[in-house]
Amino acid sequence: SKTCQGNTIRRNAQDIKELIDHLGLEHVVLLGWSLASSIVVSYAAEFEQYKLNGLVTMDGSLYPFSDADWNHHRGRDYNLQNWFDTFLPLYYAPKLFYDKFIARVSCAEGMDDEIRAWFEAECKKTMPWTALELHYDFCLTDNFSNLKKITVPYAVFGAQSKAYGLDMVDRFAAEVRGYSEVHKFYKSGHLMFLY
């Protein structure tokens, strides 16, 4: 059987362009959370903000393997061993992966059983090898440098966490050439919209 491939940041950005064209959309505001922050910034840069009226990123690093001072991602400075230790269990030990992942993305109070079941079910809709391919490409892709191409209004939301940190959002907003807003969350964790 053929394994899925091509699930990259760039390909996802191209999918957005194709969907906007297919639906005949105008005046689009794109929002990307977590890894998808990199996808929407990649779209804006690659397609010169085609049909965009605004851009929003929520708690997502734009270059996880970067050694920059704003980057607190566990893959910082090409820490491949940490990436392998953190993400490969998705393939060979899914329960271990989800236990650690959910603890990392939840707010301080944790996640109740009903929300956890929903969250895991949503995550499992993507095959492990496809998810790993996309996440690895996300870590390798420098979308921080693409922020200087952004001229549409830009809002960045960030949560205080070890994985990301709030200095990241200030740096991102400072890089864009147009209007920007920063929104910081101090207690909600990576899933800020859920709590």
Regions flagged by a language model, labelled:
Residues 2-6, 66-69, 167-168:
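Conserved catalytic-core motifs of eukaryotic protein kinase domains, centered on the activation segment
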Residues 193-195:
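Post-His helix in hydrolase/transferase enzymes
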Residues 41, 45-46, 51-89:
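Flexible "cap/lid" loop of the alpha/beta hydrolase fold
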Residues 67, 72-73, 89-149:
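Conserved alpha/beta-hydrolase catalytic His-Asp/Glu region
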Residues 1-35:
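Active-site loop/oxyanion-hole signature of alpha/beta-hydrolase fold enzymes
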Residues 151-189:
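Conserved loop-alpha-helix segment in the C-terminal half of the alpha/beta-hydrolase fold
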Residues 33-45, 50, 54, 63-64, ...:
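A structural preference for long, well-packed, hydrophobic secondary-structure segments
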